[in-house]
Regions:
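Short hotspots in intrinsically disordered terminal tails
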Residues: 1-2, 340
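Hydrophobic h-region of N-terminal signal peptides that target proteins for export
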Residues: 14-23
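Composition-driven detection of intrinsically disordered, low-complexity segments
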Residues: 11-13, 329
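Compositional signal for N-terminal targeting/processing segments
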Residues: 22-343
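Bacterial N-terminal signal peptides that target proteins for export
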Residues: 2-11
Length: 343
């Protein structure tokens, strides 16, 4: 009897220990939710992406999980679409397209491309893998972003500052005059963050963001191909809430008879991955939820991110956020990865 009781006690203790370990379980590097906050997984993303015309991956620029999943999704789309894949990225600007084409077609060496192209400081760790994948498979890769010198002009002088540029220069950006909607939430937030800053930056910084969004949308649309998926990588703020690039893409596509099937993915940070926080609901068709203490490939400041990380808004104070934003958005801030937009 005593032996049975001891056995039961040991079994009870063992069961509790197992339950405690199980409760801790694996520590997931990410969780996926759909826009309504329901649990999803990578397979759901891939299935939806295969059926889309354009897929936006809104990343956090220095997050390793984002970069790894971008590469995996590109590989799986390549296989699932029998090679019918086009890739584009915010991180490469229009005046780099010729160099990019030469590298993709093996006309020039990788080291020559990397030496001559304007690349972000985290290019080798974060973006080279997907560019190299495209090169190895002979995929079309589109440098979608406006050259930063032109967005810097807008940041200084407003959209009117582009009136004097020539036809060749205009070919590297969205058609002018630009349709700009200051009431879009993504632009209003930027304006609020730099309100009261010098040199009309509160007014012009959202316009600089808009010319980037419009240019990326324009060159995505110019390269969309029936039966192909156009997979575009950009900072999350550029496509969150189906605004930014997505809004311009829909505007430019209105002249076409066929509506584009657009899928958006965004990355957010949360301390608790068990459920999607209310503020992150509806940001995209799929939300990639990453631990708040995830290690980063570089400090955000090292690549010139001007706006605060994903999830930080004007209503969520960040130490010296406004001062830091203004400093990084200064007229001569053309160095670094991104001179006048967010992550």
């Amino acid at each position: 009897m005593k032996i049975d009781m001891k056995i039961k006690t040991y079994i009870g203790i063992f069961t509790i220990m197992v339950l405690l370990v199980a409760a801790k379980g694996d520590r997931p590097a990410y969780r996926v939710f759909n826009g309504k906050g329901h649990a999803a997984d990578y397979g759901d993303i891939l299935k939806a992406a295969r059926n889309a015309d354009v897929v936006f991956f809104g990343e956090s620029h220095t997050d390793p999980i984002c970069h790894w999943l971008e590469l995996q999704l590109a590989k799986d789309l390549y296989e699932g679409k029998n090679g019918h894949l086009i890739i584009g990225a915010e991180m490469l600007e229009r005046d780099n397209q010729l160099l990019l084409n030469e590298y993709i077609s093996s006309m020039i060496r990788k080291k020559d491309f990397e030496a001559e192209a304007k690349l972000w400081p985290n290019y080798k760790t974060d973006y080279a893998p997907i560019v190299d994948f495209a090169a190895n498979k002979g995929l079309k890769f589109i440098a979608t972003n406006i050259p930063r010198r032109y967005s810097a002009i807008v940041n200084l002088k407003g959209l009117e500052g582009l009136d004097s540029i020539n036809a060749l220069e205009r070919g590297m950006m969205a058609p002018l005059p630009l349709k700009y909607n200051p009431e879009l939430a993504c632009y209003k937030k930027i304006g609020e963050m730099v309100a009261g800053s010098p040199m009309h930056m509160g007014e012009n910084l959202p316009k600089a963001q808009a010319i980037k969004d419009a240019t990326m949308a324009w060159f995505i649309l110019k390269n969309v191909n029936e039966g192909y998926v156009f997979f575009h990588i950009n900072g999350s703020y550029h496509s969150d809430n189906h605004e930014g690039i997505v809004w311009y893409l829909k505007e430019y596509n209105k002249r076409n008879a066929t509506e584009l099937k657009i899928l958006t993915i965004t990355a957010v940070e949360q301390n608790d991955l068990d459920e999607l926080e209310k503020d992150n609901l509806g940001k995209a068709d799929f939300i990639l939820c990453i631990p708040g203490d995830m290690t980063q490939t570089q400090e955000a400041s090292a690549i010139g991110i001007a706006m605060p990380p994903a999830g930080i808004t004007p209503a969520t104070p960040m130490k010296d956020a406004k001062a830091d934003t203004i400093k990084k958005a200064a007229p001569d801030s053309g160095s670094g990865g991104d001179d006048d937009d967010d992550d």
